[in-house]
Regions:
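Short non-domain terminal segments
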Residues: 4-5, 16, 29
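Core hydrophobic alpha-helical transmembrane segments of single-pass membrane proteins
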Residues: 11-14
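C-terminal motif of bacterial Sec signal peptides marking the signal peptidase cleavage site
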Residues: 17-21
Length: 146
């Protein structure tokens, strides 16, 4: 009986430690069998932006980001002004920072990279945060797969 209780308590401690260490993202799943890279590699569609806690109106704007397994990235911004639709495409690379807490995007030919703190990362949803160093403004972006 004492051995059973001991092993039950030990199993609970090990499981709690294991499950609590599986996610580094505040809003993410606590356990997944998919690697962070396999969750990040996807076709992402920006569904919402909040800036300093206020939701921004995204009507007439569409941002699509494709992150490939080889580290390449393509961002496609579509927007409509006075009934005319425009599209801008930027190519570059993506990577995680050393502890995989941030997504780092670098446009081809750019000298500066954009860093986004990852708040949530599942196979279907990603939430990132970026702080503008010059203004201190905080933007939270929510992405879903298409």
């Amino acid at each position: 009986m004492k051995k059973t209780i001991f092993f039950s308590v030990l199993s609970l401690i090990v499981a709690t430690t294991f499950l609590s260490s599986c996610s580094k993202y505040d809003e993410g799943s606590k356990f997944t069998l998919l690697t962070k890279k396999s969750r990040m590699v996807n076709n992402w569609h920006l569904t919402s932006i909040t800036q300093d806690g206020l939701a921004l109106n995204m009507s007439g704007i569409s941002l699509h980001m494709e992150l490939m397994k080889d580290g390449s990235a393509t961002n496609t911004l579509s927007y409509t002004v006075l009934g005319q639709t425009f599209e801008d495409v930027a190519v570059g690379t993506w990577e995680f920072n050393d502890d995989k807490s941030k997504l780092v995007l670098t446009e081809t030919g750019a000298t500066i990279s954009d860093e986004y703190t990852i708040l949530k990362l599942t196979k279907d949803e990603m939430k990132t945060e970026q702080i503008d160093p010059s203004t201190g403004s905080v933007s939270v972006n929510t992405w879903n797969t298409k």
